[in-house]
Amino acid sequence: MMTKVLGMAPVLGPRPPQEQVGPLMVKVEEKEEKGKYLPSLEMFRQRFRQFGYHDTPGPREALSQLRVLCCEWLRPEIHTKEQILELLVLEQFLTILPQELQAWVQEHCPESAEEAVTLLEDLERELDEPGHQVSTPPNEQKPVWEKISSSGTAKESPSSMQPQPLETSHNYESWGPLYIQESGEEQEFAQDPRKVRDCRLSTQHEESADEQKGSEAEGLKEDIISVIIANKPEASLERQCVNLENEKGTKPPLQEAGSKKGRESVPTKPTPGERRYICAECGKAFSNSSNLTKHRRTHTGEKPYVCTKCGKAFSHSSNLTLHYRTHLVDRPYDCKCGKAFGQSSDLLKHQRMHTEEAPYQCKDCGKAFSGKGSLIRHYRIHTGEKPYQCNECGKSFSQHAGLSSHQRLHTGEKPYKCKECGKAFNHSSNFNKHHRIHTGEKPYWCHHCGKTFCSKSNLSKHQRVHTGEGEAP
């Protein structure tokens, strides 16, 4: 189980004595304070994982409550199976990481296991480079080892888990660019010399405690780097130590908070949506490193996702998921439209498309529709009305979508591009058919012989063998 909450709550100071009216009031305030900053998804996950049998009167109630908590966390009504699987894999992946890396990755709030892996790979590359510096999330520019030290180990007492005010320590000066991003309050101190003087006076009584924290932070820094090096057999431990020594000797110390030069050395906080990661091949920019890593595969041709059944490789995990369905041959639940499913629940969900209430009925053929607009568009088939005309060649269409698709023949526009091979298409249906070549997906299933097809037209041709209308292709 993950020992930390994804994301960091804002740093809070100690409560004034006058707020602590009574034990009950203190308890309520702490609950509200925690609930305010916990991400909802992580809060539901913790409720599910920390639920105890003693909280319910009996086994049936316990099972029922667990189901409710699980649904609140995984949200099956809005998440797909792949998204739910990714949440579970991400949780387990963070659990098996070494403690030092686990805390660091959680601070970056990865949304998927793939993004967590990309963060670790980026960290390895940064540690391999001379004069490296560990990147931190935009909202909290704090040293990695300082974060781990402040956010705690598994055996901390409850009192130590309370948020503490940020302390300025001279121990961070020796780390060069790995410094703390100034918050709004600290920037006010930097602009007002009187506040800087008051701040220094208030921290002089805690110098011994700061020195102890600094030594602990140094030890944790060495721990997280040693974990990375230990998992890289090609890296030399001696070479890494030399790099660390050179770094300590050459990096300029952090200037005082009150000096103008010190304020200029602090990196500016990235603006939301800023695209700082640029592809060296084509110049395309991305807002995070994981998207850049995925994009690079279009240039390198790398396909890290391999099917364990047939060995076929893919550049994206989503394509592997689609392909893997082709090996799940057992699809006993089929629909009249030709699609087949491995579970009856999936078939029922699909059949709702056919059994939806359709109050608008065509007088000519009896076909029903759920919306009036759909009936009007359908009725043009019988009347032959084609109100949408192409200005280039004069060809007319019964639907606006047909005109838009046709006009791309004149403009040459092909907005639907395949990520695997780069081929582009002017219509989404053509793109979907082409994409099945890469994934191997064959969703159309013959209920007579079990043969599968990638398109409905191929299934219709094949079924003529069983009906006696013609030969199979």
Swiss-Prot record:
CDD domains: SCAN. Residues 127-171, 244-272 are annotated as: Disordered. Residues 45-127 form the SCAN box domain. There is a cross-link at residues 27, 221, 232, 349 (Glycyl lysine isopeptide (Lys-Gly) (interchain with G-Cter in SUMO2)). Transmembrane segments: none annotated. Pfam families: SCAN, zf-C2H2, zf-H2C2_2. GO terms for cellular component: nucleus. Residues 148-171 have a biased composition (Polar residues). Keywords: Activator, Differentiation, DNA-binding, Isopeptide bond, Meiosis, Metal-binding, Nucleus, Repeat, Spermatogenesis, Transcription, Transcription regulation, Ubl conjugation, Zinc, Zinc-finger. Strong transcriptional activator. Plays an important role in spermatogenesis; essential for the progression of meiotic prophase I in spermatocytes. Belongs to the krueppel C2H2-type zinc-finger protein family. This is Zinc finger and SCAN domain-containing protein 21. The gene is ZSCAN21.
